[in-house]
């Protein structure tokens, strides 16, 4: 009610609240997948509980110091492909209730070169699309009802920050992420700085310098 007084709408569109990037221990994250759906159902209108799916250009293969990092990630990707994804799709369908609470199939891909991206599918039986790069992923997505959008764009380029040289606005990527739990990608001076172990947000990779 207060929002309508401050910013009245000229249309009859409604506001819905959701979370389109929510991790759990299906791959690497915290908490049971069912708990994630239950928590979302209790307070939101829609959700995508998003597994980590791939990292085509994961570095460090020849560095024994990084073996544990590689094993941590690739082990999760393997679990997803050995029954985890099917369980995820089944539970997403279980919680999807038209007119009450909507679920979306999504998954995340990491990339040193292009930056991390998230797929958000319209179809509740969407397959896990394998790719050799983010550009390959976008090419394979053509003709499907799916968005492939950049995530935590403000990190350093070349280390999972977004590669703006590859940005093309269109049906596959109609929007980009401004906020996430990582922080604000708009500016290096804005609130909510990037505090993850991938480093700070250099101004050259934020939205204002795109």
Segments predicted by a language model, with ranges:
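Extended, charged catalytic domains and RNA/DNA-binding interfaces, predominantly
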Residues: 1-208
